[in-house]
């Protein structure tokens, strides 16, 4: 159970980081 929770947390963090980076690049291109 702990492994599944840890994996899910890692996946969520990776998705959030990717989304933040994507938004950041879009803002840079808009400027």
UniProtKB/Swiss-Prot annotation:
GO terms under biological process: photosynthesis
Subcellular location: Plastid, Chloroplast thylakoid membrane
SUPFAM superfamilies on file: PetL subunit of the cytochrome b6f complex (SSF103436)
Molecular function GO labels: electron transporter, transferring electrons within cytochrome b6/f complex of photosystem II activity
Signal peptide residues on this chain, from the entry's feature table: none
Membrane topology per record: Single-pass membrane protein
Annotated Gene Ontology cellular component terms: chloroplast thylakoid membrane; cytochrome b6f complex; plastid
Parts of the chain that traverse the membrane: 4-24
The entry's keywords: Chloroplast, Electron transport, Membrane, Photosynthesis, Plastid, Thylakoid, Transmembrane, Transmembrane helix, Transport
Pfam family, one: PetL
Keyword Chaperone attributed: no
Superkingdom of this protein's organism: Eukaryota
Function noted in UniProt: Component of the cytochrome b6-f complex, which mediates electron transfer between photosystem II (PSII) and photosystem I (PSI), cyclic electron flow around PSI, and state transitions. PetL is important for photoautotrophic growth as well as for electron transfer efficiency and stability of the cytochrome b6-f complex.
Oligomeric and partner information: The 4 large subunits of the cytochrome b6-f complex are cytochrome b6, subunit IV (17 kDa polypeptide, PetD), cytochrome f and the Rieske protein, while the 4 small subunits are PetG, PetL, PetM and PetN. The complex functions as a dimer.
Family according to the record: Belongs to the PetL family.
Protein name (database record): Cytochrome b6-f complex subunit 6
Classification of source organism: Eukaryota, Viridiplantae, Streptophyta, Embryophyta, Tracheophyta
